[in-house]
Curated annotation (Swiss-Prot):
InterPro entries: Aa-tRNA-synt_II, aa-tRNA-synth_II, aa-tRNA-synth_II/BPL/LPL, Asp-tRNA-ligase_1, Asp-tRNA-ligase_1_N, Asp/Asn-tRNA-synth_IIb, GAD-like_sf, GAD_dom. GO terms for biological process: aspartyl-tRNA aminoacylation. This is Aspartate--tRNA(Asp/Asn) ligase. It comes from Ruegeria pomeroyi (strain ATCC 700808 / DSM 15171 / DSS-3) (Silicibacter pomeroyi). Aspartyl-tRNA synthetase with relaxed tRNA specificity since it is able to aspartylate not only its cognate tRNA(Asp) but also tRNA(Asn). Reaction proceeds in two steps: L-aspartate is first activated by ATP to form Asp-AMP and then transferred to the acceptor end of tRNA(Asp/Asn). Belongs to the class-II aminoacyl-tRNA synthetase family. Type 1 subfamily. NCBIfam families: aspS_bact (TIGR00459), PRK00476.1 (NF001750). One of its GO terms (cellular component) is cytoplasm.
Length: 593
């Protein structure tokens, strides 16, 4: 017999009754029934009930074991009495009578219990992550993650892609976040960087003549943490292809992701890839207040400025006299009660706005009546025009925000989400995907007037050099994101592979030719040697698994995540370097006040 086990703790069934077996695992739960000890023995695969009484030579030793001790038992498989069968367990028809016990590892008093559903502070869970990971939900999440990655790999290989690894230590590159710098011992005063993404390398792979690349790539970014983002590192399904259009990229990655969500989505509806809408970035902001809309929510915001221009509601009327302002309406079907309207108004105030105007419609017997402060100020003709434009009726409401769109769109998007959730409009058993396209390449700083890249600096401008010679703020890129249920899952672009267009694009953002060559020298030089048109994207594995696991926090699907302050409490990172380490690297630490 094997030194530790003949079966896993999920393998034994009624067919094994009478066999002598060996199991190893953790003591999940101990129950003393008056001289008979019952132990739920757990391993990665499942749970088996084992028992022991005073007739067994192992009884005295088994009395001493406690939760989370790691033990090995030898025993005989017995059938449970019919009234004691547990249909919820694969091993629920049997139990193992213990004849021999070996303690493989004792456990001290536990800082958190593995058994049960008790909640613990995240700090405790992360400090003792190896215990937290023993919990059933965490085991399921990590297994799901492994299965998702394996499925992605298989699907990419089936599409003719090959997996190539790119360097983990490279040069610093401005790609939208702060780099993690690594000092060089051999080159004092110089630094490597951990890659924010394999961006330049995967493009160089295309220039090298490889047609289809992918990898499960680690990425490192020094970012502020969020519930859906790690502050230090994450993994992505990274891919790139030569001789492709934007639609080719969509047609490649969409079936892969749809297949993964169908395979692991637990029966939730997955929109077919051909039904994933392509929404312009400007329209996404206008309709949903975000470039990662949750399309499970049917609410679409609309511009209602004309109904307030010159109206009796002075706040909006005067606002519209300013250039670049508008009034945006958020329809709220079934939200037509003063209580709900007041609650949403309070929500806007918590978000830092003065409030939200609202109108709700009710049946007054003789016909439809518009109610609320706005309705009183703008009159029945305007409120009726608004109602018809928004397609609302009795029992419905509409909320209004005004100003320059960038000043209120974020709050409007949040309000749309809250309205959809509270009114039961948002589907909960569906994965709704949408491509966001036509991203602006540039943005202008309102204070300085300077132009900088709004998104990926490596994307090909629509219209090429001719577009760059016109108004920079009108230039759109062959750049795209894929949103699902309010999260950005994929980001990508058709790349700018022509050196003269690359120089012009960076020039408009204030980068001189020398700086471009210094920062992106390898890529810039490679483009002088017959670079093919190419494009690709990257899908965030952590967020995908988070959605599939129905978790609200990305740390629930990462094996050893950092906390909100970018600290690893278990490994005590970041740590202070020793004086010898600093001396060897030619560094000294200067702490700023």
């Amino acid at each position: 017999m094997h030194a530790y086990r003949s079966h896993t703790c999920a393998a034994l069934t009624a067919a094994n009754v009478g066999e002598t077996v060996r199991l190893s695992g953790w003591v999940h739960r101990v129950r003393d029934h008056g001289g008979v000890l019952f132990i739920d023995l757990r391993d990665h695969y499942g749970v088996t009930q084992v028992l022991c009484d005073g007739d067994s030579a192992a009884f005295a030793a088994l009395e001493k074991v406690r939760s989370e001790w790691c033990i090995r038992i030898d025993g005989t498989v017995k059938a449970r009495d019919a009234d004691l069968v547990n249909p919820k367990l694969p091993t629920g028809e049997i139990e193992v009578y213990v004849r021999e016990l070996e303690v493989l590892g004792r456990a001290e008093e536990l800082p958190l219990m593995v058994f049960g559903d008790q909640e613990y502070p995240e700090e405790t869970r992360l400090r003792y992550r190896y215990l937290d990971l023993r919990r059933e939900a965490m085991q399921a999440n990590m297994t799901l993650r492994s299965d998702v990655v394996a499925s992605m790999r298989r699907r990419m290989w089936d599409k003719g892609f090959r997996e190539y690894q790119t360097p983990i230590i490279t040069a610093s590159s401005p790609e939208g976040a702060r780099d993690f710098l690594v000092p060089s011992r051999l080159h004092p005063g110089r630094f490597y960087a951990l890659p924010q993404a394999p961006q330049q390398f995967k493009q160089l792979i295309m220039v090298s003549g490889f047609d289809k690349y992918f990898q499960i790539a680690p990425c490192f970014r020094d970012e502020d943490p969020r519930a859906d983002r790690s502050p230090t590192d994450f993994y992505q399904l990274d891919l790139e292809m030569s001789f492709v259009t934007q639609q080719d990229v969509f047609d490649t990655i969409a079936p892969v992701l749809a297949g993964v969500f169908e395979e692991f989505g637990g029966g939730r509806k997955v929109d077919a890839p051909q039904d994933w809408p392509q929404i312009a970035y400007a329209d996404a902001a206008k309709w949903y207040g975000t470039d990662k809309p949750d399309l499970r929510n049917p609410i679409k915001m609309q511009d209602c400025s004309e109904h307030f221009r010159g109206s009796g509601f002075a706040i909006f009327a005067k606002l519209l006299e300013q250039e670049g302002t508008e009034i945006r309406a958020i329809p709220a079907p079934t939200g037509g009660s003063r209580k709900f309207c007041d609650r949403m108004n309070a929500f806007a105030q918590k978000e830092g706005l003065p409030g939200m105007g609202y109108i709700f419609w009710r049946d007054q017997g003789e016909g439809l009546e518009a109610a609320g402060p706005l309705a009183k100020n703008i009159g029945p003709e305007r409120t009726e025009a608004i109602r018809q434009q928004l397609g609302l009726g009795v029992g419905d409401a509409a909320f209004f925000l005004g100003g320059k769109p960038k000043s209120f769109e974020k709050v409007a998007g949040k309000a749309r989400d809250v309205i959809g959730a509270e009114l039961g409009l948002t589907e909960t058993d569906r994965f709704a995907f949408a491509w966001i396209v036509d991203f602006p390449i540039y943005e202008r700083d309102e204070e300085t007037g300077e132009i900088d890249f709004e998104h990926n600096p490596f994307s090909m401008p629509q219209g090429g050099m001719e577009a760059l010679n016109g108004d920079p703020m009108a230039v759109r890129g062959y750049q795209y994101d894929l949103a699902c249920n309010g999260y950005e899952l994929v980001s990508g672009a058709i790349r700018n592979h022509k050196p003269e267009i690359m120089l012009k694009a960076f020039e408009l953002a204030g980068y001189g030719a020398d700086e471009v060559k210094a920062r992106f020298g390898a890529l810039f030089n490679a483009f002088h040697y017959g670079a093919p048109p190419h494009g690709g994207c990257a899908a965030g594995i952590d967020r995908i698994v988070m959605l599939l696991a129905d978790e609200a926090n990305i740390r629930e699907v990462m094996m050893f995540p950092m906390n909100q302050r970018a600290e690893d409490l278990m490994m005590q990172a970041p740590s202070e370097p020793s004086s010898d380490q600093l001396m060897e690297l030619g560094l000294r630490v200067i702490l700023q006040d």
